[in-house]
Swiss-Prot record:
Record Gene3D superfamilies: N-(1-d-carboxylethyl)-l-norvaline Dehydrogenase, domain 2, NAD(P)-binding Rossmann-like Domain
Keywords from the UniProt entry: Fatty acid metabolism, Lipid metabolism, Mitochondrion, NAD, Oxidoreductase
Gene Ontology annotations of biological process type: fatty acid beta-oxidation
GO molecular function terms attached to this record: 3-hydroxyacyl-CoA dehydrogenase activity; NAD+ binding
Name by which UniProt lists this protein: Probable 3-hydroxyacyl-CoA dehydrogenase F54C8.1
Site entry (Important for catalytic activity), positions: 153
Primary enzyme class: oxidoreductase
GO cellular component, one term: mitochondrion
InterPro entries, per database record: 3-OHacyl-CoA_DH, 3-OHacyl-CoA_DH_CS, 3-OHacyl-CoA_DH_NAD-bd, 3HC_DH_C, 6-PGluconate_DH-like_C_sf, 6PGD_dom2, Mito_3-hydroxyacyl-CoA_DH, NAD(P)-bd_dom_sf
Signal sequence, start to end: none
Amino acid sequence: MFTAKCAMQNIRNVAIVGSGQMGSGIAQVTASSGFNVMLADVNKKALDRAMKAISQSVTHLSKKQKGTDKEKSDFVTLTMSRIKTCNNVSTAVADADLIIEAAIENIDLKRGIFAQIEQSCKKDSILTTNTSSFLLEDVAKGLQDKTRFGGLHFFNPVPVMKLLEVIRSDDTSDETYATLIKFGTAVGKTTVACKDSPGFIVNRLLIPYFFEAARMYERGDASMTDIDEAMKLGAGHPMGPFELADYIGLDTVKFVMDGWAAKYPEVQLFEASPLVDKLVAEGKLGRKTGDGFYSYKK
């Protein structure tokens, strides 16, 4: 059984499962903060891409944060030396004090990963998910010991964004939660606490905001550009809702809202937008495809 003494252990070894944009970013900030990192992915090519991206990002940051050439070189070398890779999840988590799942947003995939993790990790390891849309209780459905499970929701790009949402379910122990807060601070993030609820804090406010903006445009209340301009100049937002949705990806925004609408059909705020549905069906997903609410093709 997971105990208070176990939870308050010193975290030294961190395993990150999933080497995509989020996983590689989490690996970078964790390693640069002095932790040993094992980055795991069943796809060897994905691991190679992740390590290349991390190296480039660390090198870029060293030029901004460090003074002399030696300080820059030492920072890059030391950070990269702390990151190891593995394409076997069971092996990767065997010695980890903290495990962060950062796979794609597929509930069955995440549950399968945690079933494998729980069978292979230490009894006192802390297990976390970086999910941005699923409830912790849904991700942890098959876990035997839910007291050592919590949420660490980083934001993209991880090396740049300062916020970390730390989430607890009804089963998360106080000791586990305190350790996660401590870890978040140790990797240089400002932590905010949230209970297990749809979208946590940021996405729970942000995603419906996108869709309300889309509905305003669909009703003919205002143009996209005027809505964006109004929120930038009137509310002090760095980007308007349409610009930000294009930046995040319309497929991602739609995926989150569709999931909430299915789970909470009585909540009108979660209703779909015909405009968003049309753009996604046409493959116009935002900046990453060159077209979304706006066109980014040169």
